Amino acid sequence: MQFDAGKMNWLGSIAPAVETMAVWHTSPVRSIDDVRSREVVAGASARGAISFTYPAVMNELLGTKFKIVTGYQGGNEINIAMERGEVQSRNNTWSSWKATKPHWLKEQKLFVIAQAGPRARDLAAPSIEDLTKSPEDRQLMELAVSGTQFGRPFATNAAPADRVATLRAAFDATMKDPEFLAEAQQLGFEVDPVPGVKMQATVEKVLATPKTVAARAKALLE
């Protein structure tokens, strides 16, 4: 499904996505510095996919040495590949790790060495944005992680401004509704809302990305 993000009216997101890079326990790697000094095999689905984007961007901007192997049909296949020893690391959201592999975290079979996007309060791993130094590199990093704000988004197509304002207010009220929050907790959904106005500003910033930065990102991911 294709759509023009700039023409959408973004109402809000239930929670942003905190992206991570994690390594399997059999690897000696426990930090970003470790991946700067030794090669680590990272599993991914395809070039341009999120699972490819994060290790590729870290290689480009942070000097890591992820060897990215593509061809896996989704995250579950990459998880199995880690268990088999085919790969040693992968990208995934923090909420997904906690929901699908809590025993891996508890038993220290998996170590998160980096996070991206809004900082997770219950995760000590460093932020890759904070480690990016030059202004040019920061522009590329900001573009790469811009999607983390969207998480579980709500949006509508062309609509009058007053209707958009009403929908955004309704979304904001829902995010504070005790009944909704209780049900979300029961279902294990994290609620850390991102306002629609903030999402709209992010889209506008991405669309205004300098051509040189966009070209660099395209070359990196293709």
Regions found by a protein language model. Give the residues of each.
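Conserved hydrophobic/amphipathic secondary-structure segments
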Residues: 1-151, 215-218
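A conserved hydrophobic position in a structured secondary element of the catalytic/binding core
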Residues: 23, 156, 175-176
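A generic structural signal for alpha-helix starts
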Residues: 27, 159-162
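An extracytoplasmic/periplasmic, membrane-proximal ligand-sensing/linker region
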Residues: 106-108, 112-113, 133, 162-222
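Ligand-binding clefts/hinges and TM-proximal coupling segments of bilobed small-molecule sensing domains
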Residues: 139-160, 179-193
